[in-house]
Amino acid sequence: MNHTDTSPIKLRKNWNAREMQALFDERAGRTDPRIYTDEDLYQIELERVFGRSWLLLGHETQIKKPGDYTTNYMGEDPVLVVRQKDGSIAVFLNQCRHRGMRICRSDAGNAKAFTCSYHGWAYDTAGNLVNVPFEAESFPCLDKKEWSPLKARVATYKGLIFANWDHDAPDLDTYLGEAKFYMDHMLDRTEAGTEAIPGVQKWVIPCNWKLAAEQFCWDAYHAATTAHLSGILAGLPDGVELADLAPPTVGKQYRAPWGGHGSGFFIGEPDLLLAIMGPKITSYWTEGPASEKAAQRLGSVERGSKLTVEHMTVFPTCSFLLGANTVRTWHPRGPNEVEVWAFTVVDADAPDDIKEEFRRQTVRTFSAGGVFEQDDGENWVEIQHVLRGHKARSRPFNAEMSMGQTIDDDPVYPGRISNVYSDEAARGFYAQWLRMMTSSDWAALNATR
């Protein structure tokens, strides 16, 4: 049995910008495999990618009432996400300023304050230090305003909660850019918006976080192989044979001109959605009042009912799969491990039986034990296992597919558009990764636009 050692591969003490520039060659379509294994590159990622990007932290319906909270991560930093009395959301480092203990150790709940279990320092729901045991006797000069946890910027987009440590970063709306157009296919089908089905699934995969994030960014290509055959066979409704389903061929891929976001989608071919989610979800998505409402709201029948399956990554680690409606964050856990946090969203005004069907089918397909999820994870794990070898890390990976075949003036879809089977969005993903890794701050990043 293959065993993937998740200990980091230590190759060098540091990287300079010139050396990092050689890790990805967009013009040639070449990626250096060391980006998936090197510990020092990973530490730079934590600072320059995860410390400066807008990161997904959940859905607003997961914290409905004042005091409702969830615990989450931004990179490897634990954070608290808390609904405030005025309806706003606060995000702050889940770390007591006294000795660094985690302030809150629960996954979710409702609280009026948070008290560190080590020495009892207490913080309000906005992250302000409000009480210190024996303050008068032992801390006569303590300025509590100076000893609150680090607070992040918070913004939402149509129900999704994002946060950013960098106060010089562009606002979320600017950061997303035309990616919002593609996010709306899942998030804005109805004026009621979306809601998260209760529960977050969490599991660990021994692979680099970029392998997972980039697949959701560009890779419809793997769906044309036999990798998911077992999952398709398991989900076929009665009376439908595998031979009856045509492989999808009509679709497009989106790459953000700048920013690293990417998406791929199929148009007018419901067979793939039928194979993944079954007839009930397929019917809800492609015909009847819900699809008509979506077509009207999104501006075209193509976007409302014929765009049946879409994969997307908002750089760096927010990914979702429209149709299955799984939303996830790829939390890095060193260069050789990622922790997946996934939940399911549905139209808030969908009938209860449709919501239940989304829950049931997503658990069956894209969850910790999902039949499709396991196939994807097996590929990523095996790649990481192979990269333990010195020779395996010494030759570049190919990212040439559909190079030079993109357009910037599609009449319907904004951004850089190519055929659905393309590496274009992957090239955009790694181009943004490289910009962030080699830029000292957001001023330098903005200069590369």
Swiss-Prot record:
SUPFAM superfamilies: Bet v1-like (SSF55961), ISP domain (SSF50022). This is Chlorobenzene dioxygenase subunit alpha. Gene3D superfamilies: Naphthalene 1,2-dioxygenase Alpha Subunit, Chain A, domain 1 (3.90.380.10), Rieske [2Fe-2S] iron-sulphur domain (2.102.10.10). GO terms for biological process: catabolic process. [2Fe-2S] cluster binds at C96, H98, C116, H119. Belongs to the bacterial ring-hydroxylating dioxygenase alpha subunit family. It comes from the Bacteria. It catalyses: chlorobenzene + NADH + O2 + H(+) = (1R,2R)-3-chlorocyclohexa-3,5-diene-1,2-diol + NAD(+). It comes from Cupriavidus sp. (strain PS12). Residues 54-163 form the Rieske domain. PANTHER family: 3-PHENYLPROPIONATE_CINNAMIC ACID DIOXYGENASE SUBUNIT ALPHA, CHOLINE MONOOXYGENASE, CHLOROPLASTIC. Keywords: 2Fe-2S, Aromatic hydrocarbons catabolism, Dioxygenase, Iron, Iron-sulfur, Metal-binding, NAD, Oxidoreductase. Fe cation binds at H222, H228, D376. Its cofactor is [2Fe-2S] cluster; Fe cation.
